[in-house]
Each structure stands twice: as C-alpha cells, then as structure tokens.
C-alpha cells in the first residue's frame, strides 16, 4: 500500500484505475487472511491515511472501497470512525461500544448482533443495513437514515431516534423504553413497529 501511495500516486488516480483496483483487492485479501488484531491495524491505517473517508457532499468513492470486506467480530470499541465509508461491509458481532460513527456511510452493511451501546451514529447512513438483534442501548441515531433497515429484535432502550428516517424499516420484536421514542422520528412511513403493526 505504501508503494501505491508514494510511487504510484494512488490518491490522484481515477476510481476505476488499475492502482485503485489493486489497492482494493489487496485490502480485501488482507481482511480475509489476517486475524482480528491485525485487521484492526489495517483498518486504523486506512482510516488515519484518509483512504476510506466518505464525502457526504460530493458522494465520491473513497480511495479504497471496502464494500464486501469481512470485519466480523472485530473489537472497535471507542474507535473514531467518523465519516468512514463502510458500505456493504460485514460487521456481524463487532464491538462498536462507544464508537464515533457520525456521518459514516453504512448503507447495506451487516451489523447483526453487533454491540453499539453508547455509540454515536448521528447523521449516519444505514439504509438497507441489517441491525437485527444489535444492542443499540443509549445509541445516538439523531438524523440517521435507516430506510428499509432491519432492526428485528434490536435493543433500542434509551436510543435517540430523533429526526431519524425509519421509513419502511422493520422493528419487529425490537425493545423500546416507550412509544415516545418513535414520536420524534422524521418518518415512520410503512415502518413495521415492534408489535408488527405497519405504520402507514
């Protein structure tokens, strides 16, 4: 990766260039082969080098696209993942307790059984994400986009859902403190509520 960055000027290459494709292939290969501790080192490097940032204004692809990466079971508790592009990344059973994911893009990500207690996902994109049975207690989802997200069996006690877009989301079997949590959501259109009532 260092050679691609320094000698091949990876940052200046087009998204469909050979250099970008090689960087992505090498990264996905590393995530398949390495243990979780080393996967965390790779992710930290990519983050610090600003190779996986998501630009909410331009919607440009990051320099290294992580879609399809396997980060299952990783310990990312307390990590600063603000604004990262984690679209379609497998994050099943990941520990994201108290992590910062403000404005991160997690569209189509798989977060089944993930620990997100106390995490800040304000403004995050979670459209079509699978958060089934995730622990979202005391999580901030203020202004988060959760269109068609799966929250089946998720623990949403003390979760901040203010101005969150929950249109067409599935909250079947989810646990809430009270119904007032949902009153401040931006949209509940066609949302499947915890008692399986569809809000239209």
Q: Which residues are covered by each model-predicted region?
A:
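N-terminal capping/linker segments that flank leucine-rich repeat
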Residues: 1-67, 72, 180-200
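Tandem repeat scaffolds
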Residues: 56-200
């Amino acid at each position: 990766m260092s050679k691609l960055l320094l000698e091949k000027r990876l940052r200046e290459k087009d998204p469909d260039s050979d250099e970008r494709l090689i960087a992505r292939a090498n990264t996905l290969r590393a995530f398949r082969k390495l243990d979780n501790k080393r996967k965390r080192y790779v992710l930290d490097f990519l983050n610090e080098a600003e190779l996986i940032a998501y630009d909410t204004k331009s919607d440009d692809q990051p320099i290294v696209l992580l879609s399809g990466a396997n980060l299952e079971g990783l310990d990312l508790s307390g990590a600063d993942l603000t604004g990262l592009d984690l679209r379609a990344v497998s994050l099943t059973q990941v520990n994201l307790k108290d992590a910062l994911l403000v404005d991160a893009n997690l569209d189509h990500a798989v977060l089944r059984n993930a620990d997100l207690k106390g995490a800040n996902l304000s403004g995050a994109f979670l459209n079509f994400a699978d958060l089934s049975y995730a622990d979202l207690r005391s999580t901030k989802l203020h202004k988060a986009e959760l269109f068609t997200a799966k929250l089946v069996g998720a623990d949403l006690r003390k979760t901040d859902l203010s101005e969150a877009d929950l249109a067409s989301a599935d909250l079947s079997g989810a646990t809430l403190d009270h119904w007032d949590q949902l009153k401040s959501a931006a949209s509940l259109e066609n949302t499947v509520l915890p008692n399986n009532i569809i809000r239209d």
